[in-house]
Amino acid sequence: KESSAMKFQRQHMDSSGSPSTNANYCNEMMKGRNMTQGYCKPVNTFVHEPLADVQAVCFQKNVPCKNGQSNCYQSNSNMHITDCRLTSNSKYPNCSYRTSRENKGIIVACEGNPYVPVHFDASV
């Protein structure tokens, strides 16, 4: 079974891809990373930074998570990210996403030993 840490990497890490200007980026990535199986995941963020930099966020500023849990952390610096949002007229299995590039801080939830990101909470 896929661990929470591995799931985070599959759903949110794209270190090799520089933030692309390709409008199809989200459509390709959401499908390629298995986030359109059974239903279209409505929103997803990819981070274009080295994995070590994203893992380091677990030791930065502790902030409350959206769900009220206390294991979320905000990055000290902005990161290159791509937000993927399902378009309103999109119908499964033809999931269609809007791609928007951002340079923002990220908030991730961390757990485990080693203490690593397991959930992408928000960008700020």
From Swiss-Prot:
Disulfide linkage: C26-C84, C40-C95, C58-C110, C65-C72
Polar residues bias locations: 14-24
PROSITE patterns (UniProt xref): RNASE_PANCREATIC (PS00127)
Region feature (Disordered): 1-24
GO molecular function, a single term: nucleic acid binding
One Pfam family cited in the UniProt record for this chain: RnaseA
Major place of residence: secreted
Cellular localisation: Secreted
Assigned EC number: 4.6.1.18
Active site: H12, H119
One Gene Ontology cellular component annotation held by this UniProt entry: extracellular region
Reactions the enzyme catalyzes: an [RNA] containing cytidine + H2O = an [RNA]-3'-cytidine-3'-phosphate + a 5'-hydroxy-ribonucleotide-3'-[RNA]; an [RNA] containing uridine + H2O = an [RNA]-3'-uridine-3'-phosphate + a 5'-hydroxy-ribonucleotide-3'-[RNA]
Keywords (A to Z) from UniProt: Disulfide bond, Endonuclease, Glycoprotein, Hydrolase, Lyase, Nuclease, Secreted
Subunit structure: Monomer. Interacts with and forms tight 1:1 complexes with RNH1. Dimerization of two such complexes may occur. Interaction with RNH1 inhibits this protein.
UniProt family annotation: Belongs to the pancreatic ribonuclease family.
Function per UniProt: Endonuclease that catalyzes the cleavage of RNA on the 3' side of pyrimidine nucleotides. Acts on single-stranded and double-stranded RNA.
Full protein name: Ribonuclease pancreatic
Gene label: RNASE1
